């Protein structure tokens, strides 16, 4: 198992729509383990494959962060949604920034699990918000796409400066 490099906004890979997974196999399961390792290392509760540069429709979630309730969603699809909610969301690809994002309060999502079996989750509250946030990533949307252009541009400018500083410190 290994920790993967998290892609930082405004990297173009975060704007790409991810491809469906066509085969659930040992290689994919190793990647999923690496995604969980990365998510825990970075202190997140959810991670989309595109956030580590892999443009496949795979999500890992662990709301509690204690490794006892890990959720894997492969090729997730929201079937139903209702209600309105929102919290200040953060993102591993945009460290240090948060914004209020409108979301559906309850959702029903269909996906494959890591064994390739179809699963259905009826999610609400933080679990529903996290699923929607990560599915946005699979569709090339980051949470700052939900805020004003001015705020988004400020964050983009600051993130580009941060990326340059990180690049210089590694050189």
Curated annotation (Swiss-Prot):
Binds 1 Fe(2+) ion. SUPFAM superfamilies: Peptide deformylase. It catalyses: N-terminal N-formyl-L-methionyl-[peptide] + H2O = N-terminal L-methionyl-[peptide] + formate. Keywords: Hydrolase, Iron, Metal-binding, Protein biosynthesis. Fe cation binds at residues 91, 133, 137. The active site is at 134. One of its GO terms (biological process) is translation. It is an enzyme of class 3 (hydrolase). This is Peptide deformylase. The lineage of its organism: Bacteria, Pseudomonadati, Pseudomonadota, Gammaproteobacteria, Pasteurellales.
